[in-house]
Amino acid sequence: MVQSAVEVLLPSAWEIEVAVVASVFLIASYWLFAYRGGGDDDVVGVGFDRSRLMQNLDSGDAFDKDKIGHLRGDTQTNAAYIVKVELLAAKNLIGANLNGTSDPYAIVNCGSEKRFSSMVPGSRNPMWGEEFNFPTDELPAKINVTIHDWDIIWKSTVLGSVTINVEREGQTGPVWHSLDSPSGQVCLNINAIKLPVNAPRAVTGYAGAGRRRVTLDQQGPTIVHQKPGPLQTIFDLLPDEVVEHSYSCALERSFLYHGRMYVSAWHICFHSNVFSKQMKVVVPLGDIDEIRRSQHALINPAITIILRMGAGGHGVPPLGTPDGRVRYKFASFWNRNHTLKALQRAVNNYHAMLEVEKKERAQSALRAHSSSVKGGGKVQVKAPEDTAAVPVKFQAFIKEEVLVNIYNDVFASTPEQVLNVLLADDSTYTNEYRSARKDKNLNIEPWHTAEEYDGQVREIKFRSICNSPMCPPDTAVTEWQHVVLSPDKKVLVFETVQQPHDVPFGSYFEVHCRWRLEAKDETSSVIDIRVGVHFKKWCLMQSKIKAGAIDEYKKEVEVMLEVALSYLKSHSSSSSHGDIDKSALSSPTPENIS
């Protein structure tokens, strides 16, 4: 009886051997993947070997060969200079650990921007080879580098810091700077570069957490009627930034810090409070260079986010890579592949949004430039000179692909008469038409030529009555107009782009319209009117906005044609500008407006 109990309770020799072998294997695997490459290497001088630098980086990342995407950004920066700080190495740092070594990482500050280097475990003489790019409006600029010792549980210990003044453009070369501590030096290579206007950040390698929605911010204050979410309470992001996805996961450092990942249209954020050690990572989507499948400890599927060169870490020391970029690795997802696709989709949507905004900014800049030159008198449309040898290609004023036909009929006037009578600078037709619609605060700029477009352009502003229940009583509207008359004066094209400002989703769309008149005989022409809605960004109510805008413009066309015919009739009776068949001057019938 006793012998049977002993056999049941005590393990056999074979079970002991299996347990010991498994323990040794797990310990060896942990040290192999967690501490491979972390040694106490000596730095003798400035010109250290780059191959040694690569060997000292934390490279325990078993990447899947199926790399998911290589992401590039091309946003714009308005900074005058870019200061590139290359953190090369440090030596003779204070030993903060019991074994006389440290786990150093650096925090680099320039103005209000803060970036984290990777952590080099178990070394008083770390090598980094990492670059940090900071935009600045002017020189001199102050660069502060503080070396910390990473602690798994407690707050990091400061090992020393140094502040460098960047006085002028140019590169300093590798220079050792003494820290404000009993021992320790850091080697930096600083290069200040003057940027051309609107230099792409793909060149500067810098997107940053603070650069957000320039076009939206310029529209005025945003009122958000909702409770602050985790992005506001934890990460102090803007009130209108909301969580699109959130995932339970863990951040890999010395071990896995479990927390939660939040994904918005602009950032990937992570928060952990293990051992009451607050860890907050805020990665701007514009700083992401690659998103890869990876593994943690061979058996735990993970996702590695690699940041572009010069971006640096955000909030927590990242992991290093041999090419100088830094990365964050997240593991312990419920569904790694599902999360990976969501992150990839968020980054793609971000860059697509930037491309759309960049095109719209360029288009708006062209219109603003075209409207900045003022002229006077009637519309002066010159016949094009003989440029067969050097053909000129003008830009399209509107998006033709969004237009739909709403009116086609015979109009009792010639294209030249419409240009000289209705659209001339001294004409009061636009004032009468806007008065008939009860619009107010009308301001009409004179016609002038524009290098970007054929013919002439002008800008008008007014406040328009809103009939939609979703809109306020009235809204400010900016309308850009473009007109061109063919050399034989038989075809007139009149195009408009309307931008409402105060309606819901007003910044998301524009109303494009084209009037085309082709001479039929000496007193009439065939008129074709097309209208459409161009969406600069996707929005939920796209179809409803499009249908409402087209219906509203159909009503406008009735009033515009009625006022136009009345104005032409009164003008023909009081001037000798041209003979108009008065019997043909009748109001447009609603049946013609489809």
Curated annotation (Swiss-Prot):
Domain C2: 67-179
Membrane-spanning segments: 8-28
Keyword Transmembrane helix annotated: yes
Localization per record: Membrane
Domain VASt stretches: 399-572
Reported induction: Up-regulated by cold, drought, salinity, abscisic acid and fungal infection.
GO biological process, alphabetically ordered: defense response to fungus
UniProt-listed SMART domains: C2, GRAM
Membrane-topology descriptor: Single-pass membrane protein
InterPro entries on file: BAGP1-like, C2_dom, C2_domain_sf, GRAM, PH-like_dom_sf, VASt
Disulfide bonds: none
Composition-biased stretches (Polar residues): 584-594
Domain GRAM: 231-295
UniProt keyword list: Membrane, Transmembrane, Transmembrane helix
GO cellular component: membrane
Sequence segments annotated as region (Disordered): 571-594
General function of this protein: Involved in proteolytic processing of BAG6.
Name the record gives this protein: BAG-associated GRAM protein 1
